[in-house]
Amino acid sequence: MSKLVEKIEHYMAVSKELGLDLSEDLISKATEDLVPSIYQQDAETVSCSDSAELDTVKKNFLANKLGVDADDATMDTAIQKVCEAMGTSNRHKYRALFYALLAKEFGKESIYP
């Protein structure tokens, strides 16, 4: 089994465990889109307590990748909602799941064809 398949299966299990309403297809495509960062321990997760990282998510992912045309408050609210959905005490907020939830929140799942 390839490392990518192992990551996808792990993220699917975590998604199920956390009760996230994400399809296997969306998780798979979000994970594939994040190679090679999913193999780097620090880059694999999102820290909801790091405002600089959340600003990067907002600018690079929401605005640039997804093309979200919303004010900062709306994007901040969506990011906070995802942080809470993944569990505030959860130290393993995997970037693939985080991005998939944000894409779903803004109705932009089609970014992952």
Task: Enumerate the language-model features and the residues they cover.
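Core of compact, soluble alpha-helical bundle domains
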Residues: 2-60, 110
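Short, residue-level hotspots on alpha-helical faces of the histone-fold
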Residues: 33, 60, 64, 100-104
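Strongly charged, low-complexity linkers/loops
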Residues: 50-58, 66-82
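Short amphipathic alpha-helical segments and their helix-coil junctions
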Residues: 9-16, 71-89
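Short acidic, glycine/proline-enriched loop segments that cap or flank alpha-helices
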Residues: 22, 45-49, 66-71, 85-94
